[in-house]
UniProtKB/Swiss-Prot annotation:
Binding site for NAD(+): G231, S232, S233, N234, T235, G236
EC number: 1.2.1.71
MF GO annotations: succinylglutamate-semialdehyde dehydrogenase activity
Lineage of producing organism: Bacteria, Pseudomonadati, Pseudomonadota, Gammaproteobacteria, Alteromonadales
Name of the gene encoding the protein in the UniProt record: astD1
Organism this protein belongs to: Shewanella denitrificans (strain OS217 / ATCC BAA-1090 / DSM 15013)
Name listed for the protein in its UniProt record: N-succinylglutamate 5-semialdehyde dehydrogenase 1
């Protein structure tokens, strides 16, 4: 069987103990949000299959964790080579299933391979062995894998974000149960096929496809030692409550944000507008780091920036992800998501928000929406929630500190940014803003994989899916070791050995 034949569509939806199996749970499907075509159908995993996958992962753990790091890295690097070899297929699969423009889908695959190299480096630098001499012995700090861990992936980056958990978990010696979003099963299936071709031993990575019932069966199973989650704040909070009484399980959460972007004085109006658009509307606004709230001063410079933002936003090209002339963004993940953004806008309008550019669902039943900008300066207080799409709320302000206070008026704390020519303004902003990612004169959707990624408050509890992922994929073990037992030269007071 050649490689292309191995990558043909499957009728089996689950990968358990090295075997492709049909699911035994409810049927579900994946729909291309750009044209409404059903591109994948299958049965989800039931509770029995979840149990079987965990049993398989537990059995594989002892062999996998006993392998040398070098041996594990050979397989991880082989997966990276598979990604490079099938990069275009992977990118087209992402675009087909998510509606994301092909140019951006290609960057996602590139980020996946880059993340592998960073994960290898992070494991060496953050979880290596430290040896210190002491009288009559040696003291060691080593790291051990947790065991069997679950990875829950999101739909917005269905390859890159699960990859950011799976790769460091495997490098550390864990075995993994991968539960992807039910909206992107086709990308998950391809991911698993490439791991299979890379030579991953049976049971080390198991794929469990399905909807809510599958996820609940996995998250609540006593046989897992931890769960790594990227997704909505609501689901993450439910997981946090569920795991509150289980201190023995590691829980890493990377969730959303109600992210602020503040402007003070910027001479380069065009560049400021570019960074605002990149912050708010990239990926149809479906990035957890996207700007949701824009603070613009009531100044002539602020007026100029807002005016150009409106004219430039109105010209944003959206369309078919595979169009020869590529759009800035394609469709949202689903018709439901698109309709949800229309409703969110209506709710804000009802609270007194004034639409400067109306967000519209282009075609009923599909995921295309035009970007929207709504002035909420004089609106009633709004709910602190993440609107996961291309809708930007504008606040006009006269006092910088008051703008920062309002930017911090959220339970979230993922990303924040300042566009300002003044470094003094930035230092003032940096000291006061609450966020795990803080940028100056750069889009707030930009983050380095070589740095921590994540937030505070309702945005998460670990720096997931980046350099610091090595920290939650293994735990430190302190040891004092000697070649033989020995009697000390002097005994403690009151102690006699005879």
């Amino acid at each position: 069987m050649n490689q292309l034949e191995q990558l043909t569509p499957l009728t089996q939806t689950q990968f358990i103990a090295g075997q492709w199996l049909a699911g035994k749970g409810p049927s579900f499907s994946s729909v291309n949000p750009a044209n409404g075509e059903v591109i994948w159908q299958g049965l989800g995993a039931d509770a029995g299959q979840v149990d079987a996958a965990i049993t398989s992962a537990r059995a594989a753990f002892y062999t996998w964790s006993a392998m040398s790091l070098t041996e594990r890295l050979v397989i991880v690097e082989a997966f990276a080579e598979q990604l490079k070899e099938h990069a275009e297929l992977f990118a087209r699969t992402i675009a087909l299933e998510t509606g994301k423009a092909l140019w951006e889908s290609r960057t996602e695959v590139g980020a996946m391979t880059g993340k592998i190299a960073i994960s290898i480096k992070a494991n060496a630098e953050r979880t290596g062995t430290v040896e210190n001499p002491m009288p009559g012995a040696k003291a060691f700090i080593r790291h051990k894998p947790h065991g069997v861990v679950a990875v829950f992936g999101p739909y917005n980056f269905p390859g890159h974000l699960p990859n950011g958990h799976i790769v460091p978990a495997l490098i550390a010696g864990n075995t993994v149960l991968f539960k992807p979003s039910e909206l992107t099963p086709k990308v998950a299936e391809l991911t698993m096929q490439l791991w299979q071709q890379a030579g991953l031993p049976n049971g080390v990575l198991n794929l469990l496809q399905g909807e809510i019932a599958t996820g609940k069966a996995l998250a609540s199973h006593k046989g897992i030692d931890g769960l790594f989650f990227t997704g909505s704040s609501n689901t993450g909070h439910l997981l946090h409550q569920q795991y509150a009484g289980q201190p023995g399980k590691i829980l890493a959460l990377e969730m959303g944000g109600n992210n602020p972007l503040i402007i003070t004085e910027v001479a380069n109006v065009d560049a400021a507008v570019h960074d605002i658009i990149q912050s708010a509307f990239i990926s149809s606004g479906q990035r957890c780091t996207c700007a949701r709230r824009l603070f613009i001063p009531k100044t002539a410079n602020g007026d100029a920036i807002l005016a150009k933002l409106l004219t430039s936003t109105a010209k944003i090209a959206l369309g078919d992800p595979f169009a020869e002339t590529q759009p800035f963004f394609g469709a949202m993940i689903s018709d439901k998501a698109a309709a949800g953004m229309v409703k969110a806008q209506a709710d804000i309008q009802a609270a007194g928000g004034v639409s400067l550019i109306e967000l519209t669902q282009v075609t009923p039943g599909l995921g295309f929406v035009t970007p929207g900008i709504i002035d909420v300066t004089d609106a009633s207080p709004l709910a602190d929630e993440e609107h996961f799409g291309p809708l930007l709320k504008v606040y006009r302000y006269t006092d910088f500190d008051a703008a920062i206070d309002e930017a911090n008026n959220t339970s979230f704390g993922l990303s924040a940014g300042l566009l300002a020519d003044s470094e003094t303004d930035y230092q003032h902003f940096y000291r006061r803003i609450r966020a795990g990612i803080v940028n100056w004169n750069k889009p707030i959707t930009g983050a380095s994989s070589a740095a921590p990624f994540g937030g505070i408050g309702a945005s998460g509890n670990h720096r997931a899916s980046a350099y610091y992922a090595a920290d939650y994929c293994a735990y430190p073990v302190s040891s004092v070791e000697a070649q033989a037992v020995s009697l000390p030269a002097s005994l403690s007071p009151g102690l006699v050995i005879e």
